[in-house]
């Protein structure tokens, strides 16, 4: 249910873009994101910090897109989010005791420290690549192409990378935890 709530605003954004335009879609994205936060609060009595942070960026960049009638703002939001994820992962890798990935998953999964560090760097590089790819597609290809890339390309790549990460984790897990 949680993953559906996270994915729903993106679906709403895509549908409203196809039915109307990027400006109406940006407004719908803001509303759908707010509703997803409210439903998350009602169901789980908590809202994750990452969800609040993402909503803040959606609200800021979506509002700028609508107010200034410039779709570049909503396009930049994607790269900024990926860039901040990259920086957070790299910061944790170099300056914290535990990599961020280990902090997020380490309570449920036991892995050697080197595995956590590799996984952390892999995700940082993945987010960096996605952010750079978004810049290219958003500003050198058509808006329709960017929308399809954002919804299907980036979502598909993230799902694939999550699956590959799961395989990597499974291979390194202690036998008694598999």
Swiss-Prot record:
The topology of this chain with respect to the membrane is: Multi-pass membrane protein
Q: Which UniProt keywords apply?
A: Cell inner membrane, Cell membrane, Membrane, Transmembrane, Transmembrane helix
Q: Where are the transmembrane segments?
A: 22-42, 50-70, 76-96, 121-141, 149-169
Does the UniProt entry include the keyword Membrane?
yes
Q: What is its main location?
A: membrane
Location(s) in or outside the cell:
Cell inner membrane
Does the keyword Membrane belong to this entry? Answer: yes
Annotated GO CC locations: plasma membrane
Physiological role? Plays a role in cell envelope biogenesis, maintenance of cell envelope integrity and membrane homeostasis.
The entry assigns this protein to a family as follows:
Belongs to the YciB family.
Stated name of the protein: Inner membrane-spanning protein YciB
Protein's gene: yciB
